[in-house]
Amino acid sequence: MKTRSTSSRHFALLGAFALASGCQTLAPTEKMADFNQLYASGNYQAAADSALQSAGGLSTEKQPELLWSLQAGTALTASGQFALSNQVFDAAEVLAKEEDTEHLVRKGFEKLTSTLVNNNLNRYSPTVYDGVMVNTYKALNSMFLADAQNARIEFNRAADRQRRAEEHFRSKIQAQKEKLSEEQVKAEAPAPANGYQPNRAEAEQTVYQAYPELQEWQVYPDFVNPYTDYLHGLYFMLGSSDKDDLGKARDSLRRVAGMNPNSPAVKTDLQVVNNLIRGTWRKQKLNPAVWVIFENGLGPEIEELLVPIPLFLVNDKIEYSQLALPKLKLRDQAYSHLELFAGNKSLGKTEQLASLDRVVQTEFKKEFPYKVTEAVISTIAKGAIQYEARRQGGLAGALAAGVYQAATTRADKRIWSALPKEVQVARIRPPANRKLTIKSPGLAEPLEVELPDSQFSIVYVKASAPGSQPIYQIAGY
């Protein structure tokens, strides 16, 4: 027989879970909102400082937080601190590797907390595209530092991550299946007569009705990121030392051309690399060229969607039942495109090369069934706690358990929010006086760019929000 003191201890434990969930959810959300505001306004240095502080700084005595390291590294690239950005991204890679090989005890603990509380108590789990973009940004940083050796290493790593993405994702999904299998067996176990017996299948059907956009998304095949592939191809074309390098460039540019069949820049680059491989053209004899790479806007955020589960799907003795799931919220372009001029002469404009929205949607859609299963199992477990609390503590117990479930039903809204919405590209001939003017509809002040005296130049432009002043960096070849 349960005593009143035992029930009180149980209620206190529920309260502790609810309090822990609230503390773990509210403070990071406020910090992320502050970071996003600084970053969107183009105040990249302040955004980097904020993210570094949230990550735990650069001290080797304390392990930084992975997501904040990703945010900080991106802001440092935008602010021109390329060496420091690579240092932060190096730490992020170490953390991501530890996450992939985490100890079984921690995995067991995180399985418990995701079921009884929510995933916000657990460490950030990096996506496949996180890893690809880390190496992509490290390669970009190295290009701006004129560090050809490390740029080559990082582009090779980025390409290797993309090749292994499907295998990595299968492993990740298998781990998720194993994580959920035990709870699923418990949840589907026969209940005693008149006991707690939820309808999991109908609960999941209710969830999918709240996500009609999943069927409309035009995802990329096989986790390909056209931005990474294009930079990889461009780098190995411009920095080629032999035909093996040119072969790498051609393979990457072919993939990008398959996804962007009407892109003038990609068509021209693929034509050039094919002629270089055949030996009909020589790199030293190519016409000078400028590539303008435009990181435009901001990628998706995650918002929380609460999906009410009708009580008849659960049990008439359950006071509260709903699921909390992540939902992608797309953000705006900063500008529709960039217009490029030599004085008053138009040289062309940028066009879309890659949609990072689609990159994120591709992985989100692939993982979504497992997120739903995890959320449903968590709700079933919490519903069982409610049922037992009502059986042992009456209405007061049921209400206490209902408060616990309401407080702990929270979606994991963590995402690398500093990524761009899309990437655009233009390939032009350099102005004779090496002075490039960049304009855009809605841009108050044009950018005046002094190009280096080199055969090839890459101008990297970034604008995060409508009306913000773009920044730019230059690499010459």
Locate predicted features.
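Bacterial Sec signal peptide processing site at the extreme N-terminus
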Residues: 22-43
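Structural motif corresponding to the intra-repeat A-B loop/turn of tetratricopeptide repeats
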Residues: 41, 79, 145, 239-243
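Inward-facing hydrophobic residues that define packing positions of alpha-helical scaffold repeats
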Residues: 51-52, 89, 96, 155, ...
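Glycine- and small hydrophobic-rich membrane-insertion segments that are intrinsically disordered
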Residues: 103-116, 180-210, 273, 285, ...
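C-terminal soluble interaction/assembly domains
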Residues: 369, 382-477
